[in-house]
UniProtKB/Swiss-Prot annotation:
The lineage of its organism: Eukaryota, Metazoa, Ecdysozoa, Nematoda, Chromadorea. InterPro entries: Cyt_c-like_dom (IPR009056), Cyt_c-like_dom_sf (IPR036909), Cyt_c_1A/1B (IPR002327). It is found in: Mitochondrion intermembrane space. Its main location: mitochondrion. Binds 1 heme c group covalently per subunit. GO terms for cellular component: mitochondrial intermembrane space. Heme c binds at residues 20, 23-24, 85. GO terms for biological process: electron transport chain; mitochondrial electron transport, cytochrome c to oxygen; mitochondrial electron transport, ubiquinol to cytochrome c. The gene is cyc-2.1. Electron carrier protein. The oxidized form of the cytochrome c heme group can accept an electron from the heme group of the cytochrome c1 subunit of cytochrome reductase. Cytochrome c then transfers this electron to the cytochrome oxidase complex, the final protein carrier in the mitochondrial electron-transport chain. One of its GO terms (molecular function) is electron transfer activity. This is Cytochrome c 2.1. It comes from the Eukaryota.
Amino acid sequence: MADIPAGDYEKGKKVYKQRCLQCHVVDSTATKTGPTLYGVIGRTSGTVAGFDYSAANKSKGVVWTRETLFEYLLNPKKYIPGTKMVFAGLKKADERADLIKYIEVECSKPLA
């Protein structure tokens, strides 16, 4: 896999608000239409307690890292066939890297 750009927090925040916020939170352990993204780095797919995952997400068994998220965010339905996530993906590498940077920074903050 090619090197992942470092990403820009502010640009990632904008991508998150436009593309992710409707279904996901990053600043709490609550779930919405999608599972919380708080603590996603290092977590195994399909393991947020209380969230009703698809069988595909539960059985994928991927550990979310910068690399796996970068690949997943390109085309979620291709990466996990059968996922319930309706998001089509982010084709631009910089946008994916920016979003990952934003998630990393937000997840490093203690919960309120």
